């Protein structure tokens, strides 16, 4: 009898081990998600503004300005062949009275790679449209530029600014406006609390 008790060997447990093998299929799904996740944050980093089409830029500088610009340009020419490095373009633009951001400089250069900035060179004739594009761009603030400026005064973060505060800014900062001009501009934009929805105000001003 004792040997018969040994007959029911607990080997059936072997097939139960094979059952977990079916689980890897379910476990395989999560890794697929983790692979997709890292790709998402990389996308925003690659977003760049399209380069400026320099062939369409019209040079508006006068003769005196062109002579002055060329003299300044030549000061940055370290080789003596009438060219400067891409990496120097931003410095030359700033020396000529412009104040472009690094992103704006890269945009007019055609969004070059970091190694190209240190190796590629440009002559004055090619640089001039870049300078003109930057000068024109800085003279024309975009909706986002102005919106960012208004947000500084939006202390409540509700999309509104006090009309009195805006009047003070318009009459004392930048290109100062007269009180009459300010009243004309703000007419109809203040609510019962003396506040102004600056997004609607901006859209109205920029559409005029």
UniProtKB/Swiss-Prot annotation:
Protein keywords: Motor protein, Muscle protein, Myosin, Repeat
CDD domains membership: EFh
SMART domains: EFh (SM00054)
GO molecular function: calcium ion binding; cytoskeletal motor activity; structural constituent of muscle
Region (Disordered): 1-51
Domain of life: Eukaryota
Gene3D superfamilies: EF-hand
Keyword Repeat among record annotations: yes
A cellular component term, taken from the record's GO annotations: extracellular exosome
One GO process term, biological-process aspect: muscle filament sliding
Domain EF-hand: 64-99, 141-176, 176-208
Ranges of biased composition (kind: Low complexity): 10-40
Role description: Regulatory light chain of myosin. Does not bind calcium.
SUBUNIT field: Myosin is a hexamer of 2 heavy chains and 4 light chains.
Protein name: Myosin light chain 6B
């Amino acid at each position: 009898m004792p040997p018969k008790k040994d007959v029911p060997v607990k080997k059936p447990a072997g097939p139960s081990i094979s059952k977990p093998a079916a689980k890897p299929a379910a476990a395989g799904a999560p890794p697929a998600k983790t692979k997709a996740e890292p790709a998402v944050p990389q996308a925003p980093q690659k977003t760049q503004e399209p380069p400026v089409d320099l062939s369409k830029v019209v040079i508006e500088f006068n003769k005196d300005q062109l002579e002055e610009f060329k003299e300044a340009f030549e000061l940055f020419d370290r080789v003596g062949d009438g060219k400067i490095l891409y990496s120097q373009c931003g410095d030359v633009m700033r020396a000529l009275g412009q104040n472009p951001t690094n992103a704006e400089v890269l945009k007019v250069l055609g969004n070059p790679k970091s190694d190209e900035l240190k190796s590629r060179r440009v002559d004055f004739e090619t640089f001039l449209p870049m300078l003109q594009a930057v000068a024109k761009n800085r003279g024309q603030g975009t909706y986002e530029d102005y919106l960012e400026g208004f947000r500084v005064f939006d202390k409540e973060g509700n999309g509104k600014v006090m009309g009195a505060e805006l009047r003070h800014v318009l009459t004392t900062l930048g290109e100062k406006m007269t009180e009459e001009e300010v009243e004309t501009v703000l007419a109809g934009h203040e609510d019962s609390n003396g506040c102004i929805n600056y997004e609607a105000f901006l859209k109205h001003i920029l559409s005029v």
